[in-house]
């Protein structure tokens, strides 16, 4: 559900300020935030978009549940309870990625491909894309090597899902603006 772990909510800043205006087609990166995370851990990002209603940039086939407030709810981005977040969608709004700083003994595998890589036809909230399953398998192999005493040189490998859907490599997406 929408309930956050107590004490986990962190305010973000953009160039030291609490808000950012992002032009159409542009990207904004927040300043770094201290928040320890584990491999495979779900993260929540709460946003407040003031003023008039705007259409979000979104990943419509995200196959995960996102939570939203009713229009006119005000700024509840700091609320860790599930109370205000009464609506659900299965899209990811506004975000392209969340980057983490991994240990020096980590590495990553980037999975680039079509809608199968993106997660089409997987189960809502099950995290059963092939990249998720590969990540779990690599984690189990890493843990087994550490338990066997072979872990001194063993590297943790993250799997990055860079799948696309709807031919978004060569056009704006499934529902481009007219």
Label the predicted regions:
Residues 1-112, 117-125, 147, 151:
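N-terminal secretory targeting modules
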Residues 114, 120-178:
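Catalytic cores of extracellular degradative/oxidative enzymes
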